Amino acid sequence: MRRQAAAEQSGDRSPHSKKVASYKTAFLQGLRMTTNRSKCASTVFIAVILSGAAVPHVSRVGAQTSQTASITIDASKVENRISPLLYGQFLEFMYQGIKGGLNAELIRNRSFEEAPNIAGLSRYWERYPDDRNDDYALAFHWDDASAYPPQRPKVDTGERAMKEHSPRVDARDGAIQRHGLYQARIPIRAGLEYRGYLWLRADDYKGAITVALESDVKQGEVYASADINVIAGDWRKYEFTLRPEHSDPLAQFVILFPGRGRLWLDQVSLLPGEAMPGGVRRDVFEKIKALKPAFIRWPGGNVAQDYRWLWGVGPRDERFTWVNLSWKNELEPSDFGTDEFILFSRAVGAEPSITVNVEGRGATVEEAAAWVEYCNGPRTSKYGAMRAANGHPMPFGVKFWEVGNEIWGDWVRGHSDADTYARNYNRYARAMRAVDPSIKLIAVGDNNMNWNRTVLRAAGENIDYLAIHHYYGRREMAGDPLNLMARPLFLERFYAQVEQLLREIVPGERIKLAINEWGLDLPDERQYSLESALYGARLMNVFERSGNLVEMSAVSDLVNGWPGGIIQANRQGLFVSPIYLVNQLYSEHRGDKRLAASISSPTFDTSREGSDVPYLDAVASRTADGRKIFIKAVNTSPTSALTTTITVQGVIAGSQAEIETVTAPSLTASNDFARPDAVFIKNKAARSGRSFVVTLPKHSVSVITLAVR
């Protein structure tokens, strides 16, 4: 996952004219909601702005005294198909993208591998009841001589093996009778069942232990508890159920040691009974399912070049905790592995798309082929038998496989030049297809056409999709917010260049694009504002206009990871970004065929992304059965609504339209945990017909649905 935009810039590099400066000032004023300035300017034929035959026609209009626009749709003319795979999503092991965000596991650092504090307790664990008084009768030691499981299969990364740890507990008779350890900030709900377990090895410990959910504020207030009788001997799993009587977003999970003697503790787990397939949080699961993702890409991203898939299969408590080299060496549990990812993806209605590690951190072509066999091989094969032993006798049938991630970037393990990558790609493709010839392979592309040219010439015959990633942000905008509003149109021209390259090197329209990472590098309040949604919607309109080439896309990221995550989930709740809202609307109203459309709109100029850029961006599509037409209209003006005349030719439209609009009182309004609906979707009905007028609010994204007779 590249956290910077493509190096290319476009448009006029000359100094600002007074006209450009005035438009930039107006946009900034619009951001601050201190002006009602409107601009009346001429539009130009959109081919000058966008180029290529796949874009709508915009006619020239004269100077205007009010902000008006028009959209004319020819429903009898289909410009291109729109792929059913177009709107997918992207998950990565990145901070709390998986752990704490997607995953329902409530215990952090449940295998005690994080470094300990002075008391000998690993990260997130504290001494109970607290540190007010000396508890001379209870001692902890972060022990690397005993841990569960005692042995794991070796996965060679070329790195020094990480020692496994568990806390050794010595409990004696003392003044503080109710003592142990705890984790804070556990969100619980009254009446919901919480299923947990832990592993214990008891030496000479005599007595029981107690697990409980308690109040952190009112010490001693117990919501639910269970006693566990400890059996002396080697490692043993103890299960328990807790059903709290009260809700508390900041409860404690407590493990108490009323007995006497020595024991070891490891692999503690606490899951809400409502956890969804793959062990996913219910609230996050429901938000993802509402997006109707066509596919979900995993495990990365940059981290795909670190990840070794064997870490994340097999019994949950026997999996590895691994160091995430891509993201500040965070330790990652392997609770969410291949099986969980596929179960989760299918449960939300998405096809899994797996990115294999190419030569990073000791990865090999044999390992990639083995992963395909684990997912798709018969149970009689070596790795198919492993899958069956893990509870899944039938093949998963994973269709989409990406061969490496951003290999051109020196921030990933396995980085190489294009020639080396192409040779490696061919080796991996042959080995993976030898296991399952039906799989679709995605190769690493770039915004650099020289990279694409080299890879396509050497490996084009083995490629189904070329993955290209787009990031854009503060550095590229150079202080001009209008650059952000225009940037997607540069990418539309870029896709035309890629299409021409494909025709030259790999003719036949066989290879398609997967824009399976796109995002913005903006401060978080702007990431979660309407401004970002306008950029996202215009870019997604570009995807639909480029439907002959672009078949897959995914915003970066789906859950947390960085401010671009469109679902931001903490332990107590979540909110969604305006880009999430756009994704939801566009996925629900994808359409199967894009219709010819011409647009008349006022325009603006930018400092880097060209001039005479239309404020209005629109795409029209229809469903396969022809009974509905969707019009996706983005008004990027920061200050003016657009009174828009819509004319539909070639069909008879119904008398009423449904309009769903992503909007907010101001361009700077942003969603957060305190104000999760500052930017929202507004629904209304409007009169429609062969020709009708709608008002597209300033800085808004609207989807207009027409019934067709």
Locations of the language-model features?
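Glycine-biased, low-complexity coil/linker segments
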Residues: M1-R2, G11, P15, C40
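Extracellular and organelle-lumenal recognition/adhesion modules and their flexible linkers in secreted
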Residues: Q64-S334, E351-T355, A363, A369, ...
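Aromatic/acidic polysaccharide-binding cleft in carbohydrate-active enzymes
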Residues: F93-M94, D480, I511-D617, R627
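Carbohydrate-binding surface patches
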Residues: D227, D612-A653, I659, S702-T705
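Aromatic- and acid-rich polysaccharide-binding/catalytic face
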Residues: D266, M394-R413, N452-L491, I511, ...
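Glycoside hydrolase catalytic-domain groove-lining segments
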Residues: S326, E330-S334, E340, R427-R430, ...
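Aromatic-lined carbohydrate-recognition surfaces of secreted/lumenal glycan-active proteins
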Residues: N357, R387-A388, A429-N450, Y495-D521, ...
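Substrate-binding cleft/loops of secretory-pathway carbohydrate-active enzymes
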Residues: A363, E367-V372, D446-Y471, W518-S532, ...
